[in-house]
Amino acid sequence: MPQPDKMAAVNNAMPQPAPEKSLSSDPQPESSKKSARFWLIFVAIALTTFLAALDTSIISTALPTITADLGSESLYVWIIDAYLLASTATIPIFAQAANIYGRRSLTLIAVCIFTLGSGLCGGAHNTAMMVGGRAVQGIGGGGILTMSEIVVCDMVSIRERGMYAGIIGGVWAIAAVVAPVMGGAFAQNISWRWIFYINLPIAGVSLVALGLFLKLARPPSGTVKEQMSRIDWGGSVLLIGSVTSIVLALSWGGSEHPWSGWQTIVPLVIGLLALVAFFAYQGAPWLREPTMPLRLFGNRTSSTLLVISFIHSLLLYWVCYFLPVYFQAVKEASPTRSAVMLFPIACTSAPAGVAAGITITKTGKYRVWHFTGFVLMSIACGLFTLLDAQSSTGRWVGFQILFGVGTGTVFTSTLPPILASLPDSDVATATGAWTFIRNFGSIWGVAIPAAVFNNQVNHAAPKISDSTVKSLLVDGGAYEHATQHFIKSLSPNPELKTQVIQVYLEGLKVVWQVSLAFCLLGFILCFFVRSLTLRDELNTEFGLKEEKPNSKNMSSEEGVVRE
């Protein structure tokens, strides 16, 4: 960020994005050997990212056990949504605060909040304590996701960020897929409380490592009053209110209330209007430091890539939430087995992302990975429409491999060009916007296919001869009953079982067809991304700094001064 004494002038002038220069003969940067301290920090960041990603879905397979133990069957959805809501709403707030209070402070605070929330969840004796703990966890998790990306961006040049983003993305992908397996294993073999307690020692080790080694620059930020005046309070309130209202609507739609009911439509409309008001407020001339400055969307490359990131995240959650419906309702897999059957995505997206990142670092070219990723995801989503009860293991594994490679390459290749199209002073806000939009996309990546699926099931349900079973599946019931137990309970009546499975297949086919449309939209948007030069010099006021033994001078290789 600009120096504080120049902040007002810089913001009033609304700094222009970096020129979108065409990439011609972009030489390979000289290799920069990283210190042991750099790698200790990076490993600690990767560990905390793993924990934050783990807790987005680790309770999915253990939720029945948790709700039965706490007696919270009617409020089970809040155990999931409290984390999602809190993490999404606080991401841009952490990004803005990082410019005011420094990266190190906000990173440590995020890990501490997450650890506190984990302890509260593990020790919960009632639903209120569990939901509250999950909300605290979500605040910390959102902070961890934001700060991990920002800190990495401050430690390496834009040219190198693809490689490190690929590693972080790989960690995220692995955590998201193994989480349901871990959750089920803890709930069945030890105790569901260890789903949360396991975070404490790992977070503790990361906290110590970050506290000892994460020494970053922090420009003077003035008095406490001056710091508080820089916070975008109005924008924060609008954003939190908007996200809360939208998450409520999407959580209720198709489950507790019909999508056409006022209980769903009213909060959704209010949330979307509040989101529009938030962006309008971000352009207010009196606003000193917006939470999400409109200049982030001021050039074709950054604005297009933010939309692409939204679509990519939407598709990732789309597939990871609805392939298990196929595995459990059609293949009759258990929840834990279903989670294992998703491993091909994690096992391919992680190495594909790292490979794409390394290639971007060496060549400076990233557009090819956007096209490659969306082509592979389009092929995969098209092939998913062919899955049926007789599909072999090779089919659903092979289709997932295509999707995994595609999603891994797109994840790694979006943030570096966004940052390349903007000034270095916008690293924190741009990274926060990118992370927020990805999280926001994940919310819609569950809601849209759920609405499509439920609508198609309602159309196909008349084919079911048993009126009782039919009533269980319509109006959102099909997703709830997409379980091994329910399908096996129909085995005494093979004809009825076949009818039910066929209804599920018809619903899923339309889900995959609509996902293909989003894949094609993402592919088309790739043409609007320009080839920019990825800067190979590190120019930041918050960078990492190595101390030389017996010297007050600091090495200029990795940053500025200590925070």
From Swiss-Prot:
Where found?
Answer: Membrane
Looking at the record, which segments are called Disordered? 1-30
Q: Name one Pfam family in it.
A: MFS_1
- Give the stretches traversing the membrane: 39-59, 75-95, 105-125, 138-158, 167-187, 194-214, 233-253, 261-281, 305-325, 340-360, 368-388, 401-421, 433-453, 509-529
User: What role does it play?
Assistant: Efflux pump; part of the gene cluster that mediates the biosynthesis of the mycotoxin fusarin C. Within the cluster, FUS1, FUS2, FUS8 and FUS9 are sufficient for fusarin production. The other FUS cluster members are not essential for fusarin C biosynthesis.
Topology relative to the membrane: Multi-pass membrane protein
The UniProt entry, under PANTHER family, shows:
MAJOR FACILITATOR SUPERFAMILY, MAJOR FACILITATOR SUPERFAMILY (MFS) PROFILE DOMAIN-CONTAINING PROTEIN
User: What name goes with this protein?
Assistant: Efflux pump FUS6
Q: Which residues are glycosylated?
A: 189, 299, 553
Q: Does the keyword Secreted apply?
A: no
Recorded hits in InterPro entries, A to Z, give:
MFS, MFS_dom, MFS_trans_sf
* Main location group: membrane
- Recorded source organism is Gibberella moniliformis (strain M3125 / FGSC 7600)
- Which cellular component terms (GO) are annotated to the entry? plasma membrane
